[in-house]
Amino acid sequence: MSQARPATLRVAVLGAGSWGTALAAAASRRHPTVLWARDGAQAQAMAARHENTRYLPGVALPHALQVSADLAQALAHLAHDPAHALIILGVPVAGMTPLCTELAARLPALGLQAVPLVWTCKGFEEQTARLPHETVQAALGAMPGLAAGVLSGPSFAREVAQGLPVALTVASGSSAVRDAVTTALHGAAVRIYASTDVVGVEVGGALKNVIAVACGICDGLALGTNARAALITRGLAEMARFGAALGAQQETFAGLTGLGDLVLTATGELSRNRRVGLEIGAGRKLADILASGMTAEGVRCARAARDRARALNIELPITEAVCAVLFEGLSPMTAVSALLAREARPESPTP
């Protein structure tokens, strides 16, 4: 770390889904932590049972973790010592704009505008095709002293909440953000690596979900592990090309938030994106899958990723194929055949 920080931070995690809850549990094992849930009944149940029965059933949460449905109360927890505090946004991409807009009104009034802030969502905003840092900049960029970054990496929330080992990357141009996240989470079961490549980390986190859907489709079609390995490898090339066009550092895609997260999401049994792909490959329709309650960020952001890539003239054949299957009625096997029929070309380690 670039400078020494106190042993104790005040942490507020905003968003009580599976990932927000898991990070709050990890932070609360060493630091005073408040988890904010928008749903009052959910917050009350979590506080009473020390369990998030909606998103992480069966996982016991630390008794030290405070849960509140009052955003003002969660932020007031930080106001006692704003110089030694951290805000973690645990909401999905779709929740970033409303939450950041609300924070823009609240943080300066409480003297919290310079508190380090990180988001954890992965994907492109559906309506705008923005990456999360662009959403944060649009909502909070005018706030003086803003220090922000992204926390990402190969991680299933349930395992983190259970205290199993995980390695994550915090990316920010601010050393205060990198240091605060390391202080809050780095410990026996959580290893934090630091980076300055916000764009690269975000592109990896977004596109790996789309590639994981493709890998699930491949597995659902029983095309074998060779085909899955090819999709993972060429999917990584798509991530690197997209990142290069946006100014990302290429080495980021060989790290935790690129290759690491892609392998986990494309192969892990807990991966929702892979499960959706498996169902598609087995012949189910997307509408039926979504109606059953199964959700996946790869479905939400696939079109936005494709549209932004087209606007930038970036070639993303796997992403294009996933969109054609999900939204345009192309059969999975026809999509595979089209990918295999592409013109032969040299393989290059660079985009």
From Swiss-Prot:
Pathway: Membrane lipid metabolism; glycerophospholipid metabolism. It is found in: Cytoplasm. Keywords: Cytoplasm, Lipid biosynthesis, Lipid metabolism, NAD, NADP, Nucleotide-binding, Oxidoreductase, Phospholipid biosynthesis, Phospholipid metabolism. InterPro entries: 6-PGluconate_DH-like_C_sf, 6PGD_dom2, G3P_DH_NAD-dep, G3P_DH_NAD-dep_C, G3P_DH_NAD-dep_N, NAD(P)-bd_dom_sf. GO terms for cellular component: cytosol. Its EC number is 1.1.1.94. Pfam families: NAD_Gly3P_dh_C, NAD_Gly3P_dh_N. GO terms for molecular function: glycerol-3-phosphate dehydrogenase [NAD(P)+] activity; NAD binding. The active site is at 208 (proton acceptor). NADPH binds at residues 18-19, 38, 122, 157, 272, 297. GO terms for biological process: carbohydrate metabolic process; glycerol-3-phosphate biosynthetic process; glycerol-3-phosphate catabolic process; glycerophospholipid metabolic process; phospholipid biosynthetic process. It comes from the Bacteria. Sn-glycerol 3-phosphate binds at residues 122, 153, 155, 208, 261, 271-273. It catalyses: sn-glycerol 3-phosphate + NAD(+) = dihydroxyacetone phosphate + NADH + H(+); sn-glycerol 3-phosphate + NADP(+) = dihydroxyacetone phosphate + NADPH + H(+). Catalyzes the reduction of the glycolytic intermediate dihydroxyacetone phosphate (DHAP) to sn-glycerol 3-phosphate (G3P), the key precursor for phospholipid synthesis. Belongs to the NAD-dependent glycerol-3-phosphate dehydrogenase family. This is Glycerol-3-phosphate dehydrogenase [NAD(P)+]. It comes from Bordetella pertussis (strain Tohama I / ATCC BAA-589 / NCTC 13251). The gene is gpsA.
